[in-house]
């Protein structure tokens, strides 16, 4: 079929949420002429649910996005109202940063960034179809009948795909926050042959700040110590005038109200059909699943400086409006609270992610990529991370360059994508530190060390950032080398000082790095014995030094495991492999292999239901029939 295109682009990104923004900025910055199409320009980078960025695992993803040259970290550093480091009492592998966002300012700043970006056109239009010829993307069709040519298309439609809002017995077609749903595109993705799933998520009510009795709640302030998501942000710019959050709880009265109205709850009445998130359940789901709990935490989170709206985190619900009001008024501090927006549930279509390659390109259609909630994930950060990788790979494909695949040992983003394409997901996927087997080397403090060079190689890290990275890396390397070369001797003067500090005296000579391995010895104490570095070190370098030195043994073991897995990842599986021709593989394994079509032995070994014997048989088969090569 011959198409008459009115405009032509290298890459078209459909949807301007957190995934779409990162995808379009990446492609345009890599030199591709890009169109970012959105149903509503006023909802670019909008936060339809929680007004925050980061948190456990997610905060590390934001730093990874930043290290690769993405925008989310920079944008939240310009627009937060509170910053807090989580899990400070735990090990370094699980520490992560979280920021309360001024949600309207966050969206405005991101829109400004997109509008001024070279090679990037921003357009309010609805895309109804993906145009495909001979198994390859050639463009898109708008709702008004316009056809735009493209060499690659990235679908980042969030919860808009056949979205339906549910509130009590009310159910109507809608995207998030009463925006338009994308129904025709959902129909046409299915017609293209993609397998479609149906998920559900929800959001809590918003209450008016001036109607809250804060005296009945517990204040939750931000941190005084400077922290940032972007490695380019300066401590001098750290916000002093932060806005606190507040903690309150449900109670028995709250639970009684919910239990008495479960028959009206869409989750239990049969109105909701989609699968909801395990790690962010609705309050009615929590009351039923955890009936023995006397109360549940609720955090009152301001949505910005210039609004009265307060997000009641932990109270996600689709109960009828009258029940929501009674529920709010049963909570300490909210007895007279004015509900400004009701909570609601939203159901939406997803592209089942086992149909994707690790580049986030669909296996079925060349040049078609998907990212974000479209792939079955939850969360702005997960979406942004996928959007960045999809955008990078769309640009690389257009330019005829080698693809970028982040491994599980490279980044949390790599863990997430591998989980999605290898295991799929039966519910909205959320990143957790427990999903990462190499989490000790995927920390928040070393994201730039892990990924900045990759960002530089693909063209997303500019000269200013690269210079700053080189300075930091050289300072780190030089100080580590110095600490590994200086010896502390067990002489009287040294041991007198050691004992004055309440520490165990030295019995043998010890290099400074070994001395720092003692749990009670931090960097400042160590250099008080051996003298300071040749130049002043930033607090972030000191944090990195302490972690790398104190956990060196564990880190080395993790790196040994990575090396073993790398050998598995290097063993490729031909794309044209005949799974039925492999004798002795278990039926379940054969079915999974056919469904997922793994690209490497490493990926095959991580598929649920595949055991080591199946992998051994597969490897023997490939060694005897290894002449075929995977083609993309």
UniProtKB/Swiss-Prot annotation:
GO terms for cellular component: cytosol. GO terms for molecular function: flavin adenine dinucleotide binding. Its cofactor is FAD. InterPro entries: FAD/NAD-bd_sf, GIDA_C_N, MnmG, MnmG-rel, MnmG-rel_CS, MnmG_C, MnmG_C_subdom, MnmG_C_subdom_sf. NAD(+) binds at residues 276-290. Transmembrane segments: none annotated. The keyword tRNA processing applies. It is found in: Cytoplasm. GO terms for biological process: tRNA methylation; tRNA wobble uridine modification. FAD binds at residues 15-20, 127, 182, 373. The keyword Nucleotidyltransferase does not apply. Keywords: Cytoplasm, FAD, Flavoprotein, NAD, tRNA processing. Homodimer. Heterotetramer of two MnmE and two MnmG subunits. Belongs to the MnmG family. NAD-binding protein involved in the addition of a carboxymethylaminomethyl (cmnm) group at the wobble position (U34) of certain tRNAs, forming tRNA-cmnm(5)s(2)U34. PANTHER family: GLUCOSE INHIBITED DIVISION PROTEIN A, PROTEIN MTO1 HOMOLOG, MITOCHONDRIAL. This is tRNA uridine 5-carboxymethylaminomethyl modification enzyme MnmG. The lineage of its organism: Bacteria, Bacillati, Bacillota, Bacilli, Lactobacillales.
